[in-house]
Curated annotation (Swiss-Prot):
Chain residue ranges for the region called Disordered: 1-20
Single Gene Ontology BP annotation: protein folding
Protein's UniProt name: Uncharacterized protein MJ0647
Organism of this sequence: Methanocaldococcus jannaschii (strain ATCC 43067 / DSM 2661 / JAL-1 / JCM 10045 / NBRC 100440)
Entry GO MF terms: unfolded protein binding
InterPro entries: PFD_beta-like, Prefoldin
Taxonomic lineage from the root: Archaea, Methanobacteriati, Methanobacteriota, Methanomada group, Methanococci
Pfam families xrefs: Prefoldin_2
Gene Ontology CC: one annotated term: prefoldin complex
Length: 71
């Protein structure tokens, strides 16, 4: 029973670490988008189609993806 608890605890910690890494990667992209000049074209891929969006729309899309992954 103790081995199972240790295993589950390790697995939970690993999942938490991976989630944090993913959030950091998303945050790096968001920071990059924020640094772009106004009027710069930004394209995102949604369901295999590339769509031109504003900088703010791209940031909001990434934030929604972060929330989706956390759920």
């Amino acid at each position: 029973m103790q081995k199972l608890n240790k295993h589950l605890k390790k697995k939970k910690q690993k999942r938490k670490k991976m989630k944090k890494k993913l959030n950091n990667e998303f945050q790096e992209v968001i920071d990059f988008l924020k640094s772009l000049p106004e009027g710069r074209r930004v394209y995102i891929e949604m369901s295999g189609i590339w769509i031109e969006v504003t900088k703010e729309e791209a940031i909001n899309y990434l934030k929604s993806k972060i929330n989706e992954k956390e759920a």
